[in-house]
Amino acid sequence: MKRIFLISLLFSLAGYCLAQEGTNFEDLTFKEALAKSQATGKKLFIDCYTKTCGPCKYMVKFIFPLKECGDYFNSNYICIMKDMEEGDGIDIAQKYDIRVYPTYLILNHDGTVYCRLDGGAVSSPKEDFVQKVKDAIELAEANRKYSAGARDRSFLKEYIKILRVHDKKRLQTVMSETMIQLGVDKLCEPENWTLIKTEINNVDTPLFRYLVENRATFSKHLGQQEVEDKIISVYSEEFRVLKMMGIDFDKRMTDLKQFEKDH
């Protein structure tokens, strides 16, 4: 009997230790959590879920209990979980426009968004959820810095590197906003031309339009074949997407032919 008791005790302690190792979600209202966030100097992490969300349940059962999650989240955040369909979760869903589950919010002490991961679940511990959060924070901080006017060469180089991995759509915008002003000569330098070749793949991107409008000058630096191959590849991708999505193909073709004729 004593032996059975000891074995049961060991299993209980093991379960307790595992629970302690994982993420500590506190039973607090949103208002209480914000107050504690301010008092402790930690940001607020909110797991926004619904009862019918399968990935939400997986995260709670298999990911948040991991030691690496506990080490990271418990050290840096006040953590709460909120059902977006009941209690103060309803207000949170409305305030932060939560449309995908799970969504993970990281809030500043005043309730403003520091970072968010919409549909941020992982499907395996091997995917490293902690690193996913860190990457999202890195992107959010870089976006804020860019929006605040940072344009120095070292920052832009690092920012574009981040965007190439995490936000291809924004990358197109940032490259157009920062690279056109360099002029054709600079854009034909190996590093810049490689970026254009690999990342500019949308016919409506201003940088692509700039390339088409100045194709003759680009060709003098890079060779006509090199430039025309790039232009044709972007048009080909556009046609493929149009057909796949069933968009008004004929009208779009007419617009693009006119653009090509004008340049």
Region annotations inferred by a language model:
Residues 99-143:
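Non-catalytic, surface beta->alpha helical segment in thiol-disulfide oxidoreductase systems
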Residues 148-263:
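Oxidative protein folding and maturation machinery
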Residues 4-13:
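Sec-dependent N-terminal signal peptides
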Residues 26-43:
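A short beta-strand-turn-helix
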Residues 23-28, 48-50, 62-89, 98:
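Thiol-based oxidoreductase modules, predominantly thioredoxin-like and allied folds used
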Residues 40-44, 75-78, 101, 108-112:
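Loop/turn elements at helix/coil->beta-strand transitions in domains of secreted/extracellular proteins
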Residues 40-54:
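Short active-site neighborhood of thiol/selenol oxidoreductases, capturing the structured segment around
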Residues 15-19:
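Sec/Tat signal peptide C-region and signal peptidase I cleavage site
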